Amino acid sequence: HNESTDEVVFNKTYIDFCQQPPLITSPGSSENPRGDKKLVLFFSIRSPYSYIGLQQAIKLAQHYQLPLDIKPILPMIMRGLLVPKVKKMYIFHDTKREAKKLGLDYGFVADPLGAGVERCYCLFSYAQSLGCEQQFILNYALAVNAQGIRAETDAGLKLIVQRSGMDWDHARTLLTSPAIDREWRQWAEDNRQQMLGQGSWGVPSFQYGELLLWGQDRIGIIEQAIREDRCNSECLFKN
């Protein structure tokens, strides 16, 4: 009998994740000097599994020097779908177990449902324009999943924005822009349709070339595909 439902009983996952040398690839473009396909992450700021998937995707992209394209999607409940309380509690405890295995902080949650999600996505394009979208999304995810920061408040959001190297005064003006609101809602839906159209129904989903996989526990398969590509590329480059 386990005293805690969050105890890690069996752990064989991720043991070799990003532990091997990244190999080399043939030269590519100036934007993608290694000539690799990019890594795409379909992501929801409210999804606990996306929180883990984000950190693993960033780690993977950095280890293999891959471009990472984060594509935010509205949470199911903000699209009119119901999530039973029992399922929510299962996800919380399961995420705690997964986070513990990976050495990630999780559990001091400030649910961003509603305004917290909207404000995140509203500022995402601004972060992209500064080239700091990964840092912004990561800081936001840490804030609402591990630090109990209420992103729907100006005080909470200001902290996240400033941690990400963004200008709070400018960010605040974007929050009340009808044009920005329409824009992010459109690209969030476009991202969802792209994900569905390629055969995945939920987040986090990872895409590398033609390979698209759902679930933060599948990212090891993505790494295998990267390594296979690099092995093949290295053989061609040598020949």
Language-model segment annotations:
Residues 43-45, 110, 208-210:
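Short glycine-centered, acidic/aromatic-flanked micro-motifs in structured strand/loop junctions
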Residues 36-38, 65, 203:
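A general structural motif
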Residues 46, 84-91, 180, 184:
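Residue-level preference for long, well-ordered alpha-helices that form the structural scaffold
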Residues 33-49:
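Short active-site neighborhood of thiol/selenol oxidoreductases, capturing the structured segment around
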